[in-house]
Amino acid sequence: MLKKAAGSALLRDPQLVKDILTAVVAAVDVPVTLKIRTGWSPEQRNGLDIANIAQDAGIKALAVHGRTRACGFKGAVEYDTIAAIKHTLDIPVIANGDINTAEDATNILAYTNADGLMIGRGAQGNPWLFQQIHHHLEHGTPLKKPSNQIIWQVLQQHLYGLYDLYGEIMGPRIARKHVGWYLKQEPALRQQFNHLKDPLHQLDFLNHYF
């Protein structure tokens, strides 16, 4: 994307962002949304300017990842910037970045006053995060963590889906990354699993663990 001057590279060219968004909004009759970062680099933070351009172009909702492109996923998330964008815009603003627990979600919503949350890496290996967040927002208390039995049931469905979609050769290979998210607290087990090439061997290995 960056080599083609697309994606977050566009943050360096606000006029081009304006032209693209205006053209897209005019070309379709469905609501158009946008996701941005806070800028190209810490020295080139222009997320607020881009957000205003987006709203003026007719964007109906804006998701903001609270880091610059140069920061990647490292460093602290700029929740202050997300809050400033939310304060300035009239359209819904969705906060994104380091939402890993229900408590994170509650605190980020309160701090930024965002209209919603966009969750990515925090849900990898933890699809229960959404239910946990909903419960915490509704009741103010943490939801009990899923049992190993429930985790195994969901993981089996995940694996069977991968095998069905990608086949018996590529399926197990792709499964290594996905299972790694579930086993991120168990690096030794993850390493053992990564040597397994057969679907049945993978399932048997995980069945013994869970």
Q: What spans do the regions from the language model cover?
A:
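A cross-domain feature marking catalytic cores of carbohydrate-active enzymes
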Residues: 34-38, 66, 95-97, 121
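Alpha/beta catalytic cores of nucleotide-metabolism and tRNA/nucleoside-modifying enzymes
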Residues: 19-22, 27-29, 43-61, 73, ...
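Active-site beta->alpha loop and helix N-cap motifs at the rims of alpha/beta catalytic domains
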Residues: 1-32, 37-44, 55
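Ser/Thr-centric signal marking residues that sit
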Residues: 33, 68, 112
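Glycine-rich tight-turn/loop motif centered on a GG-T
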Residues: 1-16, 67-79, 141
